[in-house]
């Protein structure tokens, strides 16, 4: 049964404090790495915003948007999106992102950017196929190597892809309207990733380290050739990012 979720901005201090608590529950981060209430307050007063998903009075999830620039224009940096575990099968993450888009467009902003882990297929599919974001930048070890994080005892680098959400692209407009978007051309290249990254990290850490290096190398080569990732192939065995020539992108 679908929950009756209300999407609205978080403005009160107790609401922002609940965003900090959701970070504790959702992200495998040390306490010192959590964004505190004052970070949310400063962001809001600097022109950013926090959108929350409410199940009655209970905050089920949130998305934090920080003022930024992209391609020489005003943008928002989507610093984090968190949804409590018991609400993660209700499409709340998507509701938050589409509300974020609406809010940005109301502010006259056409771009939102954020980072995500290139090794996680579920996130990649959501970002590129459900939201219509593109990727054209890879940052090795973006946050540094943190051996203290719960799922990173082997010392994996914090590699990240930068997602660019062009809020009025033909693909994003179609997806926002609930329509299916079909690419007109064939991808120039594909970069395969593993179907279950966390299982590989636990069962074969050495292989996980080598896979991360391979994926990094392939993305750096593809972006160096001017390719842009704007699709993702879901496959139980061989999921893959789909990369196209830059001039095929519909901004």
Where are these regions (language model features)?
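Intrinsically disordered, low-complexity, positively biased terminal segments
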Residues: 1, 107-109, 126-131, 135-251
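A conserved beta-strand-loop-helix scaffold within acyl/acetyltransferase catalytic domains
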Residues: 5-85, 230-235, 245-247
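Charged catalytic carboxylate motif
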Residues: 18, 123, 214
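A conserved beta-turn-beta hairpin within the catalytic core of GNAT-like acetyltransferases
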Residues: 68-78, 88, 110, 186-191
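Short, structured patches in soluble enzyme cores that scaffold and shape functional sites
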Residues: 82, 116, 165-167
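Residue-level recognition of the GNAT/N-acetyltransferase active site
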Residues: 84-86, 117, 194
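Conserved acetyl-CoA pyrophosphate-binding loop and the N-cap/start of the following alpha-helix
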Residues: 87, 91-99
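Conserved GNAT acetyl-CoA-binding A-motif
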Residues: 104-117
């Amino acid at each position: 049964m679908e929950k009756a979720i209300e999407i609205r901005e978080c403005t009160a201090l107790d609401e922002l404090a609940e965003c900090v608590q959701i970070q504790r529950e959702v992200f495998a981060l040390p306490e010192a790495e959590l964004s505190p209430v004052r970070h949310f307050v400063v962001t809001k007063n600097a022109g950013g915003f926090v959108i929350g998903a409410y199940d009655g009075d209970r905050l089920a999830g949130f998305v934090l948007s920080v003022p930024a620039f992209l391609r020489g224009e005003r943008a928002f940096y989507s610093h984090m999106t968190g949804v409590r575990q018991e609400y993660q099968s209700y499409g709340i993450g998507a509701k938050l992102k589409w509300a974020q888009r609406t809010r940005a467009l109301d502010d006259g902003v056409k771009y939102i950017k954020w980072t995500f882990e290139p090794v996680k297929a579920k996130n990649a599919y959501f970002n590129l196929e459900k939201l219509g974001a593109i990727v054209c930048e890879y940052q090795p070890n973006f946050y540094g190597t943190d051996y203290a994080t719960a799922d990173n005892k082997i010392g994996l680098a914090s590699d990240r892809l930068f997602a660019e959400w062009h809020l009025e692209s033909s693909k994003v407009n179609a997806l926002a309207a609930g329509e299916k978007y079909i690419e007109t051309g064939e991808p120039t290249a594909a970069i395969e990733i593993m179907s279950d990254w966390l299982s590989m990290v636990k069962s074969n850490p050495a292989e996980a380290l080598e896979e991360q290096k391979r994926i990094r190398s392939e993305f750096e080569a593809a972006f160096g050739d001017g390719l842009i990732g704007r699709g993702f192939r879901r496959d139980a065995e061989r999921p893959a990012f789909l990369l196209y020539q830059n001039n095929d992108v519909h901004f």
